[in-house]
């Protein structure tokens, strides 16, 4: 007979595992905190056993890491708490510690304490924010957060708001679907085979537009890359010429993607001028502000987003500049009804009729059914820091980027690619010992890559990008970056530069 009086002990089990994991993750973060005071030297320090302490990463190539990791999954019984702790310990050990000050590689960096808490809360709730009745509080939070964020960008109509998506690429993809189904409604039923659409984006824009074109069945050939000016901003005259050319070829100009904070140089496209072209030819105007959109919280820097209020849709990803945990992205608009018209379906098993005129079953606005409530992560960060706190953090990051840029500019051994101060938080530059560029692009690229690799052994991780003179350094500063980190980075670069020439 079944034991109907059997009790669950999940809370006790969770408490036990949480305390065990806490004993691993807190030292992981603390190690990064304690290492930050040493970054100003530009090199690693030794521990009591005279071993170099690289809190950032233990670098191994894939095959070597596989051999050391020895990760397998059990065929029969699980490994229990001991096996779990062993695996978590190894994951922490062999992962990049993004909490370390030396992580300056990508547009995303570490999260922060409130970010970790938000992930725990979402894990506890483990619900789907597709229909209101299974996620009432989270649905309200997403609606309010999306509406409030939209208002910051100048979207103030009664139907303004936004939805959260799983990253900037997902937001951009959703915007393209909404654009097609809004401007050409027959596509929702019949597909787009009756049209040869043309999508326009800067040649410095993110590759997610190509991915979106593939996903929507438009193909890579539908994406037209617009040249940029010397400053990296989209050339509006060239855009207009390319639109006219596309029409002459029998194509249907559908959509222009302007970028507010390009991936490499951090440049902001001229939004007002691009909007004028979109109006002239009846195209959807989207702004990809995944990276640069967060400066809307800064009175000092938000002028770079002038014209964003004219967009039909706008992407912002707080998991980048604001250190909200990945993933957290919003697609905002002045007209959420266009999202509903483009994406809603008659699924009676899921969506039930209500007397409320406002859409609360948020899956009707998105491309997804299963969707995590990432908006909570932004909401909790906003509650914790406040808009003023976001502003201070952003202004600090820009100050650090400008300081690094000034150090580079004053040195005879480096040459800036980005202006001083940079438009966003990327500082791009070449190594030019004695003021001389290498004799070939290949040699410049070799030096750049060799220096990047050597800097990992000094506790700094950053990237490089192709340029007209070969690969150049691309260092991304973030809201947590300290002055000593910036100065230590430069000292390290000076030292490793002498080793590669």
From Swiss-Prot:
GO terms for cellular component: cytoplasm. It comes from the Eukaryota. The modification N6-(pyridoxal phosphate)lysine is found at residue 320. GO terms for biological process: carboxylic acid metabolic process. Substrate binds at residues 106-108, 474. GO terms for molecular function: aspartate 1-decarboxylase activity; pyridoxal phosphate binding. Signal peptide: none annotated. SUPFAM superfamilies: PLP-dependent transferases. Its EC number is 4.1.1.11. It catalyses: L-aspartate + H(+) = beta-alanine + CO2. Pathway: Secondary metabolite biosynthesis. It is an enzyme of class 4 (lyase). The keyword Lyase applies. InterPro entries: PyrdxlP-dep_de-COase (IPR002129), PyrdxlP-dep_Trfase (IPR015424), PyrdxlP-dep_Trfase_major (IPR015421). It holds the Pfam family Pyridoxal_deC. Keywords: Decarboxylase, Lyase, Pyridoxal phosphate. Its cofactor is pyridoxal 5'-phosphate. Disruption phenotype: Impairs the production of destruxins. L-aspartate decarboxylase; part of the gene cluster that mediates the biosynthesis of destruxins, insecticidal cyclic hexadepsipeptides which induce flaccid paralysis and visceral muscle contraction in insects through targeting the calcium channels and vacuolar-type ATPases. The aldo-keto reductase dtxS3 converts alpha-ketoisocaproic acid from deaminated leucine into alpha-hydroxyisocaproic acid (HIC), which is the first substrate for destruxin assembly by dtxS1. Belongs to the group II decarboxylase family. This is L-aspartate decarboxylase dtxS4.
